[in-house]
From Swiss-Prot:
Gene name per UniProt: ccmE
Residue ranges annotated as Cytoplasmic topological domain: 1-7
One GO term (biological process): cytochrome complex assembly
Main location: membrane
Subcellular compartments: Cell inner membrane
Assigned GO CC terms: plasma membrane
Originating species: Methylibium petroleiphilum (strain ATCC BAA-1232 / LMG 22953 / PM1)
Name of the protein: Cytochrome c-type biogenesis protein CcmE
Length: 154
């Protein structure tokens, strides 16, 4: 082969390899992409059928029913409500009236079967360990509006 033909074959090979790699990356990205839907969107059939998605809203008051590791509750956005079934241990912050995000699929019976449940918290959340450390070490600095830890040395 002439040098020009060799270069052409090399360029075509590189372009083909980059194209295959890009297709594989996009396919992997698309299969791991999980969208967020509100209960109103799920009720309006905007959520994908047979595919995982995230359902977010508030845990409806009085809806939590525990049966061993199986927990049933209702997620609402104050417009529509979707029943959820989850098997596993719930996060410590999971409470009625608080925000929650559940990842899973909508069953044929209209019940959202969650694989994972995440409890949402507001921006003022502080882990219990940090709150205890702050109480032991000192108070908060009200002038600045932020929490300050005072270091004490023996």
């Amino acid at each position: 082969m002439k040098p020009r033909q060799k270069r052409l074959v090399l360029i075509v090979g590189i372009v083909a390899a980059v194209g295959v790699a890009a297709a594989l990356v996009l396919n992997a990205f698309q299969s791991n992409l999980v969208f967020f839907y509100s209960p109103a969107q799920v009720a309006a059939k905007e959520a994908p059928v047979g595919r995982a998605f995230r359902l977010g809203g508030l845990v409806d008051g009085g809806s939590v029913q525990r049966d061993g590791l199986v927990v049933r509750f209702v997620v609402t956005d104050t417009v529509k409500s979707i029943p959820v079934r989850y098997q596993g241990i719930l996060p410590d912050l999971f409470k009625e009236g608080k925000g929650v995000v559940a990842q899973g699929q909508l069953g044929d019976d209209g019940v959202f079967v969650a694989r994972e449940v995440l409890a949402k918290h507001d921006e003022n959340y502080m882990p219990p360990e940090a709150a205890e450390a702050l109480q032991r070490a000192g108070a908060s600095n009200q002038k600045l509006g932020e929490t300050v830890v005072k270091e004490t040395r023996p």
